[in-house]
Amino acid sequence: MQKLLQDRVAIVTGGAQGLGAAICHRLAREGAQVVVADLNLEGAEITSAQASAQTGCRTSAFKVDVTDESQVEAMIRHALAEFNRLDILVSNAGILISGPVEAFPAEKWRAVIDVNLYGYFLCAKHAARVMIGQGSGVIIQINSKSGKKGSYKNSAYAASKFGGIGLTQSLALELADHGVRVNAVCPGNLLDSPLWVDSLFKQYARNQGITEEEVRQKYIAQVPLKRGCTYDDVNNVIVFLASDQASYLTGQAINVTGGQEMR
């Protein structure tokens, strides 16, 4: 059976753990050769080795800070040196820091924008240079439901994600003539992910004055389908967007939220 992404070459930023690692594994299972890019090189190497061992696909790990343009350029050069082309960029690297606006440290607010929006721009810029030359390519940003609706005491993250959708649409318009499609995926709450378990439950419980379990139940109650988002939910959409099945889709920001954005 032909795999949807057979012999495509993909870069996944933020690929060392959590959703990023799950994306790398799924792309490899679909036949892609994957560069696992992350600030955490050790984690990227583990993900790369596991994905290759489980699928037989070629993978590679690369250390990158997506806010450093020279490092992003080096990441693209690495992909070309290893695999000779670049078909898919999944811009997944991101951070989330929440807090009340009146007490939000400006440097932390700026850090969220730098990673989530400026980092996406840099990766898309240098991937686009290659894809324009090839006459084909797919750029996918991992956005959020917070890119479409304001988020309580989460102004930096929401601002970065709203900006990401604007950037996605603008790049889609600019690159369409070159055969390059640009889309975003807007996941709901990945309640069982390391991001939530290790960080967000604690942040939100503190900011909202409730327990971590009450935070979980609050967010589940907001979802018409009454469950959290899973990695498979997100990856099903990523694979579709990266494949030829989505050849007529560009400039879209697809919700994967169980209907939460309607509440």
Model regions: which residues?
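Substrate-binding pocket helix/loop in short-chain dehydrogenase/reductase
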Residues: 100-101, 108-113, 201, 219
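Active-site loop immediately N-terminal to the catalytic Tyr-X3-Lys motif
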Residues: 102, 149-156, 177-178, 226, ...
